[in-house]
Amino acid sequence: MKKITLALSAVCLLFTLNHSANALVSSPSTLNPGTNVAKLAEQAPVHWVSVAQIENSLTGRPPMAVGFDIDDTVLFSSPGFWRGKKTYSPDSDDYLKNPAFWEKMNNGWDEFSIPKEVARQLIDMHVRRGDSIYFVTGRSQTKTETVSKTLADNFHIPAANMNPVIFAGDKPEQNTKVQWLQEKNMRIFYGDSDNDITAARDCGIRGIRILRAANSTYKPLPQAGAFGEEVIVNSEY
């Protein structure tokens, strides 16, 4: 009888261990959740375009005025903004209202900014077309600035195509870029922010989204394609 009891106990133990092992195998892991083909194939319903496709869409059209935002569009300028925050207002974004910060940012701190590859491709394309290139930024205007030279040097923009940077500034409840897009008769405007795209839409021109890098200090990241605009692939760098 004792042997039978021991045998039954052993069987029960084996069953329990086997059940536990199966549970461990079949239970999803929160650390390694895995994926499947459907998830891998899922894409956001966005109007993606390439630089080559944009160039092709302009075939046969005469030279025109085109505009670019600066920060997170043609330059990854977070290093300068990060330094400004640490220097002037570590616990808030008040540095953005400090003229001393803008004097630094507009007069040298863009030496720490990284030119974006997508901007190189776009600007090269527009230079080949003979287009007039403008940069319209929401930065505050300062008495002097070296941003125009920095951009011209970094992107090798000939003087015939380059225009001085337009410092539109930032005003509450107002998209300050609209008047400049209209005044300069721009036909395309590239930008990373919602304001860039809505400025183009308000002017009835083509607004094209460039992706903001995930490690930009400018948060939250915008929802690219939310207005049905074209979004350039691989444009986060």
UniProtKB/Swiss-Prot annotation:
Binding site residues for Mg(2+): 69, 71, 192
Q: Which cofactor does it need?
A: Mg(2+)
User: What Gene Ontology molecular function terms does this protein carry?
Assistant: acid phosphatase activity; metal ion binding
Q: How is the cofactor bound?
A: Binds 1 Mg(2+) ion per subunit.
Where does it localize?
Periplasm
Signal peptide extent:
1-23
Q: Name one Pfam family in it.
A: Acid_phosphat_B
Family statement drawn from the similarity comment of this UniProt entry: Belongs to the class B bacterial acid phosphatase family.
The protein depicted here goes by the name: Class B acid phosphatase
Protein's organism: Salmonella typhimurium
What would be the name of the gene that encodes this protein?
Answer: aphA
